[in-house]
């Protein structure tokens, strides 16, 4: 199962205890993946579609617990795509009107569903209800990337108005949600790992949150180790390049002017480098008698390189 599927499975098992939160979550389901069907006799029914059986059960349970209404569930199989679509249906006109009035999608005195309202601010007035509403929107039309690969959270909306409402709700929790137009849909998204942790906490997907945090910690540890290895590799390459240049300069001086024409202290450093081509500056300094520090041996080797460059210039050699 994908990480996104695990999050939805966890959220589907979370049924809020407060009736106002149950109504807020059901409002999200109706608004995101529900339709109101009106027949020729002006009688209406509600149909909520999802490809996730656990989400379908969640909607069924919410309707039953909140309104004491028994809805029907139908299954439609797509053999070509090998997918199943579950529809939770409230068939009775009176039941559908009751639900639409409670979710404030129609007025309290309205007896038909010809004109549906957008999400009423009163439905998401309390913080707990905002959490429940976002929980519903994600289950209905959301997805998340595998955190091992990338950090991406999104909710796909059919209308710009709904996208802005969801974006504003997420931003009310001090997050920076954005909206992008993708084909004919409006997508509300988050891309930062820390904000995705926050949204999981807001939706109360605590098990998924811990899994994501574990992935983040491991990724940060790997990145830290990689940075350290890269830094050490760069230092090793730098040290090796410097040692190779020193050996070239020392060999050039030995062959061109001879060590007898070079000060004794520099000759000692030159012989030490020839004898220990792979040694670090610290190791070279310690091999001398008496030993010298890292800066001391570095100074001598630099003098040898300067001397070699000078001889090359005098003899018309390449720098």
What are these regions (language model features)?
Residues 198, 202-299:
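Extended mid-to-C-terminal alpha-helical interaction segments
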Residues 24-32, 132-140, 271:
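Short, hydrophobic/amphipathic alpha-helical patches that form generic packing surfaces
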Residues 57, 61-82, 87-213:
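DNA-contacting interfaces and partner/effector-binding or oligomerization modules
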Residues 306-316:
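Short, Lys/Arg-enriched C-terminal cap helix and immediately downstream tail that follows
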Residues 15-23, 123-130, 260-264:
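Structural motif
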Residues 41-46, 148-149, 280-282:
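Short acidic, hydrophobic short linear motifs in intrinsically disordered regions
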Residues 48-50, 154-158, 287-292:
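Short helix-coil junctions and helix-kink-helix linkers
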Residues 1-102:
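N-terminal low-complexity or simple alpha-helical regulatory segments
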């Amino acid at each position: 199962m994908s990480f996104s599927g695990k999050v939805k499975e966890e959220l589907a098992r979370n049924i809020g205890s407060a009736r106002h939160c149950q109504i807020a979550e059901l409002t999200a389901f109706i608004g995101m993946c529900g339709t109101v069907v009106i027949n020729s006799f002006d009688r209406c029914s509600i149909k909520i579609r999802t490809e996730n059986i656990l989400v379908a059960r969640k909607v069924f349970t919410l309707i039953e617990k909140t309104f004491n209404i028994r809805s029907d569930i139908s299954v439609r199989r797509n053999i070509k795509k090998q997918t199943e679509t579950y529809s939770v249906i409230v068939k009775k006109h009176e039941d559908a009107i009751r639900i639409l009035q409670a979710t404030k999608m129609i007025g309290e005195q309205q007896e038909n569903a010809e004109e549906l309202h957008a999400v009423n601010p009163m439905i998401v007035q309390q913080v707990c209800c905002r959490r429940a509403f976002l929980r519903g929107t994600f289950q209905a039309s959301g997805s998340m990337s595998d955190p091992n690969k990338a950090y991406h959270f999104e909710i796909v909306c059919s209308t710009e108005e709904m996208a802005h409402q969801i974006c504003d709700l997420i931003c009310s929790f001090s997050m920076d949600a954005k909206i992008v137009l993708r084909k004919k849909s409006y997508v509300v998204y988050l891309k930062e790992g820390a904000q995705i942790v926050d949204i999981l906490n807001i939706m109360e997907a605590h098990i998924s949150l811990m899994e994501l945090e574990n992935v983040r910690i491991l990724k940060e540890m790997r990145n830290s180790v990689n940075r350290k290895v890269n830094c050490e590799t760069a230092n090793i390459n730098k040290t090796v390049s410097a040692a190779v240049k020193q050996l070239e300069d020392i060999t050039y001086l030995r062959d061109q002017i001879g060590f007898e024409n070079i000060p004794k202290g520099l000759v000692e450093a030159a012989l030490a480098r020839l004898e220990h081509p792979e040694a670090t500056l610290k190791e070279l300094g310690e091999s001398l008698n008496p030993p010298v520090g890292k800066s001391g041996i570095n100074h001598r080797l630099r003098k040898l390189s300067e001397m070699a460059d000078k001889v090359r210039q005098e003899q018309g050699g390449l720098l």
